[in-house]
Amino acid sequence: MADVPGAQRPVPGGGPEPRDPLDCWACAVLVTAQNLLVAAFNLLLLALVLGTILLPAVTMLGFGFLCHSQFLRSQAPPCTAHLRDPGFTALLVTGFLLLVPLLVLALASYRRLCLRLRLADCLVPYSRALYRRRRNPQPRPARSSPGPQVAPTSGKVWV
């Protein structure tokens, strides 16, 4: 038999067979595009969750830094009408104290959302672009007796 470059040859052992070079390249581009879309959705979800949960702390820090006389000396009406420097210092301290617990809460909720949406399952490994899976039919086990089948017990008894 002649050895043709790029021809599909069966791999001994029934494992995955390599794809043609052009097919491999096209699949690699598609796998990369899908993985980039999943990563972009992950970043968008992370920004949405962090932005929503960290909003109170960021607002306090923003007003504290914008209105305190040691930083920007802003003469905007919200800065001069409501608080003085001790109030803006309290805003800064409270904002920094709230930042870490809210960050932990935001990351925990992001993780829970990722697990619930199963976003990690959407990532495709590059081995799928390089190898084609063989579809071998799984043989069904033959029934030994025509009677009802008893499920194996695990040793636990529920009373």
Curated annotation (Swiss-Prot):
It comes from the Eukaryota. The keyword Transmembrane applies. Its main location: membrane. Signal peptide: none annotated. It is found in: Cell membrane. The chain crosses the membrane at residues 43-63, 88-108. Keywords: Cell membrane, Developmental protein, Membrane, Transmembrane, Transmembrane helix, Wnt signaling pathway. Residues 135-159 are annotated as: Disordered. It is a multi-pass membrane protein. GO terms for biological process: negative regulation of canonical Wnt signaling pathway; Wnt signaling pathway. GO terms for cellular component: plasma membrane. Inhibits the Wnt/beta-catenin signaling pathway. Crucial for heart development and acts downstream of GATA factors in the pre-cardiac mesoderm to specify lineage commitment of cardiomyocyte development. Belongs to the TMEM88 family. Interacts (via C-terminus) with DVL1. This is Transmembrane protein 88. It comes from Bos taurus (Bovine).
